[in-house]
Curated annotation (Swiss-Prot):
Keywords: Repeat. It comes from the Eukaryota. It comes from Arabidopsis thaliana (Mouse-ear cress). PROSITE patterns: ACT. The keyword Repeat applies. May bind amino acids. Residues 22-105, 111-194, 243-322 form the ACT domain. InterPro entries: ACR1-12, ACR2/9/10_N, ACT-like_dom_sf, ACT_ACR9/10_C, ACT_dom. This is ACT domain-containing protein ACR9. Coiled coil: none annotated.
Amino acid sequence: MGILNDDAVLIEPGKISGDPTVVTVNCPDESGLGSTLCRIILEFGLSITRADFSTDGRWCYIVFWVTPDISSPKIDWDSLKNRLLSACPSCLGSFYFCLQSNVSKPPSLYLLKFFCRDRKGLLHDVTKVLTELEFTIQRVKVMTTPDGRVLDMFFITDAMDLLHTKQRQTKTCDHLTAVLGEHGVSCELELAGPELESVQRFSSLPPLAADELFGPDGFDISGSSSNKAVLTVDNQLSPAHTLLQIRCVDQKGLFYDILRTSKDCDVHIAYGRFSSKVKGYRNLELFVRGTDGNKIMDPKHQANFCARLKEEMVCPLRVIIVNRGPDTELLVANPVELSGKGRPRVFYDVTLALKSLGICIFSAEIGRHSTLDRQWEVYRFLLDESREFPLASLRARNQVVDRVTKTLMGW
């Protein structure tokens, strides 16, 4: 393992306006590093338009071409570089030593509470501030009182690991107060101890809703969806690697989905090329090996890996609307990696989509749901009925699902 310096991560702006920014990472390798780097890039509201990836198992070299999402026009490139450097193994530079030495320590969980008057788009505006401050939202409880006020409780972790300081806490509350304006009433931050466990509890999903989200008939990727992702396995071209060729519909987070799935399936990528989009499709070439360092020759292993990849590319997130008593509830399910993390910015994108439709959120929560073979992060939004958007209408419900799905997928 080598000693890294600032040159381990280089960020080169595009030469003209509209050109992608080139992010180069050159550092020691470790299992799942590519997936971790993609996750960080997504957290900053960036889309990966191209990528080249190569590793010999000890050292890796990755080049990302990235562009800001429409909803993230301002990017803190210095902060992105710091985060990428902190993810690289053997970051022994004095500035990053503290970050790297605490990599194995789980981040402290904090509870952010604020009480204010409700308005359309409030939840997204707060989420936007937290995202820009580099907080990760782990759990949420949002409740509206009969007099039109809202109590929001966000369980958050800090990517900068500075929330224990008075300066960071003050900056957070000041930013929120500036956004809430006259709507703001109070803002509190505290370390989330065991006594707050009951507040974090996630109400269980109704069986019918769970069936629709996770059942075998809920999201069928066969049939008409099969042309969205085509995978070809070749064990003849390379003497040491299995070549996996992929052609699929482009979407936000596609390269991340492929890398996280490969990691969870114990498939190691030695070389990968994520080509530019052509007519809405992406072409990828991955030279891969199994955990034993050899080609993937077992037909059953090949079939299982390809089936899992196809599912994650065609249907990485699940979105439905159900009745919850007399009310209407939006459910979004996000697969959780074996590392325990789900796709970033899901809450941000869903609240953005609902704000764009002018739909108020009466209550919201984030929790975990386990199925036979995996764990899911589930987002529940109880939606306010309005004259402008009658949610009893099937057409209106389909419009909500369509807008949320397209925002999540970057379509």
